[in-house]
């Protein structure tokens, strides 16, 4: 099992350059860890668009990802990959350390995003339109990471993350309505 204690360790193992010590966007198409289980010591948000053999494991059950699915992990949680020990073929991993939230509005609101405590069987399934919106949020975060770090970086990054999480709240509510 891989145990990523820092965003830097995660980037190094997954072959990504660290642009900010507390937050990273990792394109899963370019990442191939050698272990099938990863423990994240920071927040992790996975957008899974394509998995080997159309399945991926969250917890102990496998799920069909016909369009896209999101999984949310709090610091200390474990993600179990597919039975082939690979990350999804297409998607993104947003990694952000709790220290990023210090002195930002997200620090006070992170507890309101209750889906971080959902069982992995309650992953968020997205429509094509929703996937496009979430991908845009990831791209905005990635674009901000390309700027040199300054006194505004943490605030801007945390606001982009908060916007992403607000969209996820909306989509979860839609999912609950349509599943009834």
Model regions and ranges:
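Short, Lys/Arg-enriched, Trp-marked, Pro/Gly-tolerant hinge/linker segments that flank
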Residues: 125, 148-156, 169-180
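Short, amphipathic alpha-helical segments that act as regulatory/interfacial helices
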Residues: 161, 165-169
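Histidine-centered metal-chelating micro-motifs
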Residues: 53, 71, 75-81, 101-102
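Short hydrophobic/aromatic patches on the structural cores and recognition surfaces of FHA
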Residues: 68
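A hydrophobic/aromatic-rich effector-binding and dimerization subdomain
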Residues: 7-13, 17, 82-146, 166, ...
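Generic protein-terminus/edge-of-domain signal
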Residues: 1-64
């Amino acid at each position: 099992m891989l145990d990523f204690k820092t965003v830097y360790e995660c980037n190094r193992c997954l072959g990504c350059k660290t642009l900010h010590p507390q937050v990273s966007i990792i394109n899963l198409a370019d990442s191939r860890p050698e272990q099938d289980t990863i423990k994240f010591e920071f927040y992790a948000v996975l957008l899974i668009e394509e998995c080997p053999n159309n399945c991926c494991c969250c917890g102990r059950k496998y799920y069909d990802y016909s369009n896209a699915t999101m999984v949310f992990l709090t610091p200390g949680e474990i993600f179990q990959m597919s039975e082939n020990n690979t990350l999804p073929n297409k998607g993104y991993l947003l990694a952000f350390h709790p220290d990023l939230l210090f002195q930002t509005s997200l620090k006070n609101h992170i507890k309101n995003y209750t889906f971080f405590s959902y069982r992995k069987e309650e992953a968020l399934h997205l429509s094509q339109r929703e996937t496009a919106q979430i991908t845009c949020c990831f791209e905005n975060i990635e674009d901000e990471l390309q700027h040199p770090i300054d006194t505004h970086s943490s605030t801007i990054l945390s606001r982009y993350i908060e916007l992403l999480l607000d969209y996820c709240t909306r989509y979860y509510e839609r999912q609950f309505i349509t599943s009834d």
